[in-house]
Amino acid sequence: MADNSSDEYEEDNKEKKKPSQLTPQQGFSENDDDDDDDSSETDSDDDDDDEEHGAPLEGAYDPADYEHLPVSAEIKELFEYISRYTPQLIDLDHKLKPFIPDFIPAVGDIDAFLKVPRPDGKPDHLGLLVLDEPSTKQSDPTVLSLWLTENSKQHNITQHMKVKSLEDAEKNPKAIDTWIESISELHRSKPPATVHYTRPMPDIDTLMQEWSPEFEELLGKVSLPTVEIDCSLAEYIDMICAILDIPFYKSRIQSLHLLFSLYSEFKNSQHFKALAEGKKVFTPPPNSASQAGDAETLTFI
């Protein structure tokens, strides 16, 4: 009897649970209907958008062409971002519109011709014959003439040069300093003189080439001739020019010019400056005096 009563109790509970389980399913079905309606509305909107945009362009991205690629899921997810992207449509106005510029280019200030007449009544033609505009620093006519002469390289043309004179120079040191600075700037900007050799001479770049290893090895054993050698100045010039592969003739002026030009190039070279600063001076040990005499070298730059 106890078993039958328990079975009946379980059957009653099952019958009570059935309607309670059916009710949420009905609620879900109603929500699903709403979702279906929303999805149908969005689909219709998408169709309208597709109709507005028209047919896909030729050569456009098609996801179906890349579905068969053997790639990982992360790469496939990256490909999905291409279809998710929607570019913004910006309408550009290409109409030409006339406008008045804010600024009008002009040389100096616009002359309003509002001049104060001279006390004697004579016309000064200011603004007509003489330029009338403000300037913080006027050019010196003498310095300007020197600049033009230097740039044109017309030094042999006879012309009337303006000589600047300064009254009461002791009371005007600023004008003297300005003149010195102007002439110094002129000399600093002066291009190097062009020299044409009458005899065949090698190029500076050729003379700056590295010596052969045999010659450098020889310089490590035999030092270069110094000024203490017993010879004349002409013979010493011939020896130095011969070591540096500079040809010399009866007149050694051109050879000396090329020699000092080579010296100037080495002195102003950034490469050799860095080598000279980074090179350590070798100090031989005190017990090897003979070895130090053999290894004595002289760097000629």
Curated annotation (Swiss-Prot):
Family, per entry: Belongs to the IFT46 family.
Top-level taxonomy: Eukaryota, Metazoa, Chordata, Craniata, Vertebrata
UniProt-listed GO biological process terms: axoneme assembly; cilium assembly; cilium organization; cilium-dependent cell motility; intraciliary anterograde transport; intraciliary transport; protein transport; regulation of cilium assembly
Cellular-component GO terms for this entry: centrosome; ciliary base; ciliary membrane; cilium; cytoplasm; intraciliary transport particle B; motile cilium
Biased composition annotated in UniProt, kind: Acidic residues: 1-12, 30-52
Tissues expressed in: Strongly expressed in ovary and testis, moderately expressed in kidney and brain, and weakly expressed in thymus, heart, lung, liver, spleen and muscle. Expressed in embryonic bone and cartilage, with high expression in non-hypertrophic chondrocytes and weaker expression in hypertrophic chondrocytes.
Origin species: Mus musculus (Mouse)
Annotated protein name in UniProt: Intraflagellar transport protein 46 homolog
One Pfam match: IFT46_B_C
Entry keywords, A to Z: Cell projection, Cilium, Cytoplasm, Cytoskeleton, Phosphoprotein
